[in-house]
Amino acid sequence: MATLKEKLIAPVAEEEATVPNNKITVVGVGQVGMACAISILGKSLADELALVDVLEDKLKGEMMDLQHGSLFLQTPKIVADKDYSVTANSKIVVVTAGVRQQEGESRLNLVQRNVNVFKFIIPQIVKYSPDCIIIVVSNPVDILTYVTWKLSGLPKHRVIGSGCNLDSARFRYLMAEKLGIHPSSCHGWILGEHGDSSVAVWSGVNVAGVSLQELNPEMGTDNDSENWKEVHKMVVESAYEVIKLKGYTNWAIGLSVADLIESMLKNLSRIHPVSTMVKGMYGIENEVFLSLPCILNARGLTSVINQKLKDDEVAQLKKSADTLWDIQKDLKDL
């Protein structure tokens, strides 16, 4: 007796298992992981989305909640499991998992605890998706990108830290607000370490090709009567502010990660400030990851733009590199 489905649907092609073309995995279904997931779904970037976490109930609940929105999405397959086999054949894997910083905990201690988490996660990712590109989002992102590169054995063009992509977006938003224009028409770059010691490249800030520093030579300095330096200060403090108000940040980082993925899956060769291996650049001698303007396309992070930086900006970059190396050199089991 034919089933309803057999009566309804007459097959033309033989049934066979299809390998996904644009599969994306998100590791960690906390606030940031789910913001990445919904941003990826909203931009219809994946034909399959896989979620992984150690918390099975939370994981299944998030998967079901997203699946129930399938009518409103163009991602035909949403799966989840604590077993990494569910991630097989991913083009891109986003890592948001990790332990949170406890009150009064040193960064080195936090990093070492996250290294221990990553020692389990990263080999599993590479086992099931040996050709993937890994985007690291967990903090401190620059150090954990280095850790991921070391643990994965992947070439450096396939291990990328979300880095200053969000810092630069915040910078452009805040400047654009001051000027009354859209952030996409306000160009400016935050480079270096994601967070407190990031570098605002004031010399490159422009609107429609007009250098703002030429209009106001004091821009970004302490002598500036308009106090533009405050904008960079607000960028650095903005995450702390949001965390103080709502307990965490997630929407903007989720959107910024989807932006990076779009450049790669659509082979756009757009330029983003993301964390990459900077040894040999700007006189940096150690294997550290910092944000520089990088070209992202289907192969991953294929090139770095040689940004003309002023001496004090280079000095700041080197200082960041030294700070990071001080922590990295003491990490165990890499």
Swiss-Prot record:
Subunit info here reads: Homotetramer. Interacts with PTEN upstream reading frame protein MP31; the interaction leads to inhibition of mitochondrial lactate dehydrogenase activity, preventing conversion of lactate to pyruvate in mitochondria.
* Outcome following mutation: residue 100 to A: Abolishes interaction with MP31
The disorder this protein is implicated in is: Lactate dehydrogenase B deficiency: A condition with no deleterious effects on health. LDHBD is of interest to laboratory medicine mainly because it can cause misdiagnosis in those disorders in which elevation of serum LDH is expected.
Modification type N-acetylalanine: residues: 2
Q: Name one GO cellular component term.
A: extracellular exosome
Its tissue distribution reads: Predominantly expressed in aerobic tissues such as cardiac muscle.
Keywords (alphabetical) are:
Acetylation, Cytoplasm, Disease variant, Membrane, Mitochondrion, Mitochondrion inner membrane, NAD, Oxidoreductase, Phosphoprotein
What result follows from mutating residue 7 to E?
In LDHBD; slightly decreased activity
Phylogenetic classification of the source organism: Eukaryota, Metazoa, Chordata, Craniata, Vertebrata
What Enzyme Commission number does this protein have?
A: 1.1.1.27
- What is the protein's name according to its record? L-lactate dehydrogenase B chain
Q: Which reaction does it catalyse?
A: (S)-lactate + NAD(+) = pyruvate + NADH + H(+)
